[in-house]
């Protein structure tokens, strides 16, 4: 399911081109937002450099699109060491990871994205590598099999995940520096957008940036994606500046409303309210009603709607809150629950 307001990386975004790399911050000072995380990282990095040691292993976790990969690259750059990147899904065999680990130089940074998708057989050889800087491998099969131990150079594993709860406890406990990345405030996203627009040569003013930021779901990746499409519309319309009006018109054509909901979000809410009286309705029923897979409904559509107080998940099923009726311009029944908004910019 491809949505312009999805925080997940889309095709072509996983491997950024030269122009995309130019838009990314290169240092902690340039990185906007995540102030507490940056302050702590700066201290840990300086301490490790002062001792001439590898930085302790870092786990970056939180919703997609908040800059985990960029932050991992910055860590390596601030340490002045090499950066190697891979991801959990591509490390199918223990040998795949062993080949990478044995080629690391002292204090290098290895980045593993989506570490929650690492196969258990690969994960097991990571434990001694992280803790003791050794690699324990079994060579051969059956009675002739033998184990060998390979010493590794000290290194820093920086891992990223959107599902920290799926990590095995032994793996999670080996990260000395766990860092949760939070959603961005509209002001922070406005800053990100203005900086990106300058590098892109897009004529975006502060009001235009504020309009895009308000609809970007607290996610820099979404903000950047919206900026590119708004720039396209502005260019096609011959606009000399992307102000609030130009940005609003472009976003309306993209069907992203003032609260960051797209047509799929609104279709879900309408199905819940108009087909099932506002609920409770089961997720399977709702998925069938909007012709989407259950996993897509649970993982892609519902999280933001719950965070923003549009729906509640109850033991009996999903229920529409008063905010959903108001947003769709429908009459709110007395029985509609008043959800406590989880807060996009707080704990989710």
Curated annotation (Swiss-Prot):
One of its GO terms (biological process) is DNA recombination. One of its GO terms (molecular function) is four-way junction helicase activity. It catalyses: ATP + H2O = ADP + phosphate + H(+). Residues 258-348 are annotated as: Head domain (RuvB-H). It is found in: Cytoplasm. InterPro entries: AAA+_ATPase, AAA_lid_4, DNA_helicase_Holl-junc_RuvB, P-loop_NTPase, RuvB-like_N, RuvB_C, WH-like_DNA-bd_sf, WH_DNA-bd_sf. It comes from the Bacteria. One of its GO terms (cellular component) is Holliday junction resolvase complex. Residues 1-184 are annotated as: Large ATPase domain (RuvB-L). Residues 1-20 are annotated as: Disordered. Its main location: cytoplasm. Keywords: ATP-binding, Cytoplasm, DNA damage, DNA recombination, DNA repair, DNA-binding, Hydrolase, Nucleotide-binding. Mg(2+) binds at residue 69. Pfam families: AAA_lid_4 (PF17864), RuvB_C (PF05491), RuvB_N (PF05496). Its EC number is 3.6.4.-. ATP binds at residues 23-24, 65, 68-70, 174, 184, 221. Residues 185-255 are annotated as: Small ATPAse domain (RuvB-S). SMART domains: AAA. Homohexamer. Forms an RuvA(8)-RuvB(12)-Holliday junction (HJ) complex. HJ DNA is sandwiched between 2 RuvA tetramers; dsDNA enters through RuvA and exits via RuvB. An RuvB hexamer assembles on each DNA strand where it exits the tetramer. Each RuvB hexamer is contacted by two RuvA subunits (via domain III) on 2 adjacent RuvB subunits; this complex drives branch migration. In the full resolvosome a probable DNA-RuvA(4)-RuvB(12)-RuvC(2) complex forms which resolves the HJ. The RuvA-RuvB-RuvC complex processes Holliday junction (HJ) DNA during genetic recombination and DNA repair, while the RuvA-RuvB complex plays an important role in the rescue of blocked DNA replication forks via replication fork reversal (RFR). RuvA specifically binds to HJ cruciform DNA, conferring on it an open structure. The RuvB hexamer acts as an ATP-dependent pump, pulling dsDNA into and through the RuvAB complex. RuvB forms 2 homohexamers on either side of HJ DNA bound by 1 or 2 RuvA tetramers; 4 subunits per hexamer contact DNA at a time. Has 3 domains, the large (RuvB-L) and small ATPase (RuvB-S) domains and the C-terminal head (RuvB-H) domain. The head domain binds DNA, while the ATPase domains jointly bind ATP, ADP or are empty depending on the state of the subunit in the translocation cycle. During a single DNA translocation step the structure of each domain remains the same, but their relative positions change. Belongs to the RuvB family. This is Holliday junction branch migration complex subunit RuvB. The lineage of its organism: Bacteria, Pseudomonadati, Pseudomonadota, Alphaproteobacteria, Caulobacterales.
């Amino acid at each position: 399911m491809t949505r312009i307001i999805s925080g997940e990386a889309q095709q072509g975004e996983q491997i950024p081109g030269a122009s995309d790399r130019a838009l990314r911050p290169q240092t902690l000072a340039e990185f906007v937002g995540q102030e507490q995380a940056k302050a702590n990282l700066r201290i840990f990095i300086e301490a490790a450099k002062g001792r001439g040691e590898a930085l302790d292993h870092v786990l970056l976790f939180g919703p997609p699109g908040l800059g985990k990969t960029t932050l991992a690259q910055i860590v390596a750059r601030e340490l002045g060491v090499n950066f190697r990147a891979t991801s959990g899904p591509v490390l199918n065999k223990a040998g795949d990871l062993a080949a990478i680990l044995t080629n690391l130089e002292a204090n290098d940074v290895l980045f593993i994205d989506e570490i929650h998708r690492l196969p258990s057989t690969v994960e097991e050889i990571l434990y001694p590598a992280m803790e003791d800087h050794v690699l324990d491998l079994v060579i051969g099969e059956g009675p002739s099999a033998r184990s060998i131990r390979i010493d590794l150079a000290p290194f820093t594993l920086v891992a990223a995940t959107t599902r920290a709860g799926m990590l095995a406890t032994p793996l999670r406990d080996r990260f000395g520096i766990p860092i949760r990345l939070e959603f961005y405030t509209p002001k922070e996203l406005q800053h990100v957008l203005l900086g990106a627009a300058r590098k892109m040569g897009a004529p975006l003013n502060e009001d235009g940036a504020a309009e895009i930021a308000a609809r970007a779901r607290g996610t820099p990746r979404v903000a950047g994606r919206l900026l590119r499409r708004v720039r396209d519309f502005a260019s096609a319309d011959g606009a000399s500046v992307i102000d609030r009006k130009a940005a609003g018109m472009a976003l309306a054509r993209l069907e992203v409303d003032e609260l960051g909901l797209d047509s799929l979000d609104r279709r879900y809410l309408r199905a819940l309210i108009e087909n099932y009286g506002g609920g409770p309705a089961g997720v399977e029923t709702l998925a069938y009603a909007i012709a989407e897979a259950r996993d897509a409904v649970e993982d892609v559509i519902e999280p933001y709607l719950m965070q923003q107080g549009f729906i509640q998940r109850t033991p009996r099923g999903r229920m529409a809150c008063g905010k959903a009726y108001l947003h769709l311009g429908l009459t709110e029944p007395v029985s509609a629950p008043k959800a406590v908004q989880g807060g996009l910019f707080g704990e989710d």
